[in-house]
């Protein structure tokens, strides 16, 4: 089986979505019957994270434009490689060319619209909902997010699976003072 992972989040600033993808796929790489294709601009960065193995492949993205990437580049890559499944965060390509796994981490822009521009809310409500409804496998990270997806997008509860956020192994056992210092935290709410 060939599985493409949209790893473009590894090209930008560090965020929770990156930790989620890294946690899932570093553990899945041991499944040698799956060929993993990680797609991003910075292939060297991905190589440093996921390493080298016979079932690990890297695909360099050429476009930095999200619309071009989702409307043109991914459908072409998926077709060229003969990908069986592709995993996207929030928004899948406009043209469906394989089975899709979509993770929607949250819908904060719908839960708290006052903190988001109207254009962002309208665009993402349409794209997230379309991606969620078309997904062959729809994932989210918590019961709260699952309930919000059901409420906002009217998607059957049975179609949504929870894959909780986790802590990366390298962060396990870090002393609390080190964590507080790295976060610049002086308050006592972390104990």
Task: Tell what function each PLM region has.
Residues 1-191:
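Carbohydrate transferase catalytic cores enriched for Leloir-type hexosyltransferases
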């Amino acid at each position: 089986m060939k599985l493409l992972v949209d790893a473009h989040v590894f090209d930008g600033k560090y965020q929770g979505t990156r930790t989620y993808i890294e946690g899932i796929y570093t553990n899945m790489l041991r499944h040698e019957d799956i060929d993993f294709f990680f797609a991003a601009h910075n292939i060297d960065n991905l190589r440093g994270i996921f390493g080298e193995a016979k079932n690990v492949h890297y695909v360099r993205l050429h476009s930095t434009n999200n619309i071009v990437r989702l409307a043109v580049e991914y459908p072409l890559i998926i077709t060229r490689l003969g990908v069986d499944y592709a995993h996207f965060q929030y928004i899948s390509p406009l043209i469906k060319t394989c089975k899709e796994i979509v993770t929607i981490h949250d819908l904060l822009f719908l839960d708290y619209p006052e903190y988001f521009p109207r254009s962002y809310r309208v665009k993402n409500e349409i794209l997230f909902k379309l991606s969620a409804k078309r997904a062959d496998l729809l994932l989210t990270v918590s019961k709260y997010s699952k309930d919000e997806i059901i409420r906002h997008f009217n998607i059957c509860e049975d179609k949504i699976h929870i894959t909780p956020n986790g802590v990366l192994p390298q962060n396990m056992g870090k002393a609390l003072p080190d964590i507080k210092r790295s976060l610049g935290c002086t308050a006592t709410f972390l104990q």
